[in-house]
A protein has these predicted regions:
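His/Asp/Glu-rich, glycine-adjacent segments
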Residues: 1-41, 74-82, 87-210, 215-225
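TRNA-binding/sensing appendages of the translation machinery
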Residues: 49-79
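Generic beta-sheet signal
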Residues: 54-57, 208-218, 256-258, 352-354
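Metal-dependent active-site segment of extracytoplasmic phospho-/sulfohydrolases and closely related
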Residues: 57-58, 239-278
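Catalytic metal-binding/acid-base residues of hydrolase active sites
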Residues: 64, 229, 264-265
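A short, conserved beta-to-alpha structural element at the edge of catalytic cores
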Residues: 80-100, 284-304, 370
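A long, amphipathic alpha-helix that forms part
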Residues: 192, 199, 219-256
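Active-site neighborhoods of enzymes that stabilize oxyanions during catalysis
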Residues: 289-395
């Protein structure tokens, strides 16, 4: 039976709900996990037959949305090889989606429901990927990662070899090493080195078959800084498209499966469409902690007794800008996916979820924190953010 959602509240205009069946990133990751752990399994997304010793490359281009591919990417090699449109998970963000692509479980289970999460054991609002408090020091605690992220990576105890091709600046971070258990880590610097590392790892797996999990973050970084339809993002896409062609040529005749997908897409947000919670404002005094989650889908923890005042504020100040949903209703909706929930999930959702309308963001401020201005954003439920391509080439 396919997982179903139970939405008992209004949704932002144009919402695309996450698909936790065969038409979403979770289904792709879950089936990949099964293939890695069963020598006799087939893997339909990669056209891998049962028992076949295939070399599979899963190339994740951070931020490459399906809507972008359909417009800016029209006529590209990547566009021509697209097989399917998938949904991201909720929230449509790297911390949630890439962790799903490394574990094979949805955000409800792995527990990373945004760039920032709330976990009082480690100081309140924290960023789990860099393992920092929000505008605070690096996290240090006994058995930090096993407690924070107890779900094992899909590579752990896999019966097929796995090589992770990862940017050198994050390849051996604490978060990366924790989620790479069972795999070989191959760091790279720059796009040319990225391609060379992928080919070298494919050569290493030629006899045994296995997975090359390759991650490229630059498109995402440029889209945040310059906008998702900027010239800079377009140039980066063109370079990735050329890499896709080069990989097919370098691996020609070997029936390597090259799959390309993304963790999420992008939308641009103007500064004039930002709900800015000023320090010491009426609503700031209702909050028991800084916002967490994403600026396109935020979670908030209220002070005890502030619920009625917050709802009254939201009814006026968020009208046409966001949908405020109680934490209980958001959890029950299934938007974070099926499965046994992470033991801290209820805390990580907070008192309310704020689902931003198209083009809107919400931010707050922490003393000493440097504001990060972003033109391109993601995390929300719009089609631009939620839809990602599944691209396949067989060499």
């Amino acid at each position: 039976m396919l997982p179903t959602l139970d939405i008992q509240f209004p949704l932002p205009a144009g919402t695309v709900l996450p698909d936790y069946g065969t038409n979403g990133l979770y289904g792709l990751a879950s089936s990949l996990r099964h293939w890695l752990h069963d020598r006799d399994a087939a893997w339909l997304p990669g056209e891998v037959s049962a028992g076949e010793r295939a070399v599979v490359i899963l190339l994740i281009v951070d931020g490459l949305g399906d809507r972008f591919l359909d417009t800016v990417g029209q006529g590209s090699a990547l566009h021509g090889a697209r097989r399917q449109t998938l949904t991201s998970v909720c929230p449509s963000t790297t911390a949630s989606a890439v962790t799903t692509l490394m574990t094979g479980v949805p955000p409800a289970v792995h527990g990373l429901n945004g760039w920032f999460i709330h976990d009082h054991r480690f100081g309140g609002v924290i960023a789990p990927l860099p393992l920092m408090q929000r505008c605070g020091p690096a996290l240090e605690a006994f058995r930090l990662l096993p407690r924070l992220c107890p779900t094992p990576p899909m590579f752990h105890h896999a019966c097929r070899p796995v090589n992770l091709v990862s940017p050198a600046d994050i390849a051996f971070s604490r978060f990366s090493r924790h989620h790479a258990r069972g795999a070989h880590i191959e760091p790279y610097k720059g796009l040319e080195d990225f391609g060379a590392a992928i080919v070298a790892m494919a050569d290493a797996l030629a006899g045994s078959g296995g997975l090359i999990h390759a991650y490229y973050p630059t498109f995402d970084a440029l889209s945040h800084t310059y906008g998702c339809r900027s010239a800079e993002a377009g140039v980066c896409f063109a370079r990735v498209d050329k890499l896709f062609v080069r990989l097919q040529r370098a691996l020609a005749g070997r029936d390597v499966r090259i799959l390309v997908t993304a963790d999420h897409g992008f939308t641009d947000a103007a500064p004039s469409r930002c709900v800015d919670i000023a320090p010491e404002s009426e609503v700031a005094r209702m909050l028991a902690a800084p916002l967490f989650g994403e600026r396109r889908l935020a979670f908030c923890k209220l002070r005890q007794g502030a619920e009625a005042d917050f709802e009254a504020w939201a009814a006026v100040e968020l009208a046409g800008k966001a949908v405020a949903v109680t934490g209980e209703a958001f959890l029950a909706s299934g938007l974070l996916g099926p499965g046994v929930p992470h033991p801290r999930l209820r805390e990580r959702i907070g008192s309310y979820a704020l689902l931003m309308e198209p083009g809107w963001t919400i931010v707050d401020h922490v003393a000493g924190e440097t504001a990060h201005e972003m033109i391109g954003v993601h995390g929300g439920l719009s089609a631009d953010e939620m839809l990602v391509p599944l691209i396949l080439a067989r060499t």
